[in-house]
Amino acid sequence: MVERFDFGVALKKLKEGKKCRRAGWNGKGIFIELQRPDENSKMTHPYIFIDTTGLQTDNPDAPKDRVPWFASQTDMLAEDWECID
C-alpha cells in the first residue's frame, strides 16, 4: 500500500530530495520536485517544478515539459500526496 499524506508532509519530503505527486491528478506519470540552484543556475532561490515528460496520455498535443509549479488551494488541502521513486 502506498503511503499518502498532506501537503505539509509532501513539502518536507521535497526538501529531502524526494519527488511527489497527487493520487488524484488525472495525468499519470507526472510529479513535482524541488530544484536547488547551483553555481551555473540563473535562479537564485529554490523552486518547485512539475515534470510532465513522463505523462501517459493518448493526446499527442499534451505538454511534456518541466516548468515552475504553483500549488492550488485544492493541492494544498489535499491528503492524497505520495512519493515516487
What are these regions (language model features)?
Residues 55-85:
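Short, compact, well-ordered microdomains
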Residues 1-61:
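Extended non-catalytic interaction/regulatory regions in multidomain proteins
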